[in-house]
A protein has these predicted regions:
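Short amphipathic alpha-helical segments
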Residues: 14-40, 79
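Short, well-ordered beta-strand segments in beta-rich or mixed alpha/beta enzyme
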Residues: 2-9, 41-73
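Aromatic side chains
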Residues: 4, 18-21, 35, 59, ...
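A short, structured loop/turn motif at beta-sheet edges
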Residues: 31-32, 62-65, 102, 106
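Short, low-complexity, polar/charged sequence segments that are solvent-exposed and flexible
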Residues: 23-27, 57-60, 76-80, 89
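Glycine-rich beta-strand-turn "strand-cap" elements at beta-sheet edges
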Residues: 39-51, 80-108
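Short alpha-helical
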Residues: 13, 65, 77
Length: 108
């Protein structure tokens, strides 16, 4: 299992429309092979980030291979759709997180 993390900063004026689009985008991604789940977070506003909303999406995939397949076969088209609709209205960064260790409370 890996986590594909997508960090989005969207202009406040377009945040509602972006979130609506993002919900559809995530549902579409979750139909692709290897995608297991997605969690969406809204970061609390920081002093230097008052004109943008920061959204973090953590996709869980069954393998690195599934992510590579998505990036090669689906990502270019899906990313182009976001650019067409929201050009200049958001910034995005992505990273891949591989499991290292899981520590669980002893009483669980």
């Amino acid at each position: 299992m890996i986590v594909y993390e997508v960090n989005i900063k969207v202009q406040l004026a377009h945040a509602d429309a972006y979130r609506e689009w993002l919900g559809d985008h995530i549902r579409e991604l979750l139909t692709l092979p290897g995608f297991l789940s997605a969690e969406v977070f809204i970061a609390e506003a920081s002093p230097g980030n008052i004109d943008r909303e920061e959204i973090v999406v953590a996709y869980r995939l069954e393998s690195h291979h599934a992510l590579i397949r998505y990036l090669a076969e689906h990502a270019p088209t899906m990313r182009a759709r976001a650019q067409e609709r929201f050009t200049g209205k958001f910034e995005i960064q992505r990273r891949i997180l591989a499991p290292f260790v899981e520590i669980v409370r002893a009483d669980l």
